[in-house]
Every structure is written in C-alpha cells, then in structure tokens.
Amino acid sequence: MVWSRDQRRKVALENPQMQNSEISKQLGCQWKMLTEAEKRPFFEEAQRLQAMHRE
C-alpha cells in the first residue's frame, strides 16, 4: 500500500485519461517486476505505520 499510494499519484498525473482499474493493473505489473530487495523498504515502512497506529 505504501508503494502503490505514491505510484498511483504519479501514474494518474502522467495519464489523466486512465481509469482507476487500468492504473491498478499497471501498478500490479510494476510491483511484480520489483525484486525483494526493492520491495523491502516498503514492507518495513508499512510495518512501522502499523505499529504507530496500534499505539
């Protein structure tokens, strides 16, 4: 969610005509292409945000 939130804004700004469902499909493909090392900071940030929310 952390990664997709930022990426969704970028894609929507670059492609204002694109439907939300199309953006989601594109983001899904992009996410799958990332390596585990590239994904790790986003997982860590999500965990940090979850911990803050629980407090």
UniProtKB/Swiss-Prot annotation:
Disulfide bonds: none annotated. It is found in: Nucleus speckle; Cytoplasm; Nucleus. InterPro entries: HMG_box_dom, HMG_box_dom_sf, SRY-related_HMG-box_TF-like. Residues 1-55 bind DNA. GO terms for cellular component: cytoplasm; nuclear speck; nucleus. Keywords: Activator, Calmodulin-binding, Cytoplasm, Differentiation, DNA-binding, Nucleus, Sexual differentiation, Transcription, Transcription regulation. GO terms for molecular function: calmodulin binding; DNA-binding transcription activator activity, RNA polymerase II-specific; RNA polymerase II cis-regulatory region sequence-specific DNA binding. One of its GO terms (biological process) is cell differentiation. Pfam families: HMG_box. It comes from the Eukaryota. Interacts with CALM, EP300, HDAC3, KPNB1, ZNF208 isoform KRAB-O, PARP1, SLC9A3R2 and WT1. The interaction with EP300 modulates its DNA-binding activity. The interaction with KPNB1 is sensitive to dissociation by Ran in the GTP-bound form. Interaction with PARP1 impaired its DNA-binding activity. PANTHER family: SEX-DETERMINING REGION Y PROTEIN, SOX TRANSCRIPTION FACTOR. Belongs to the SRY family. This is Sex-determining region Y protein. It comes from Meles meles (Eurasian badger).
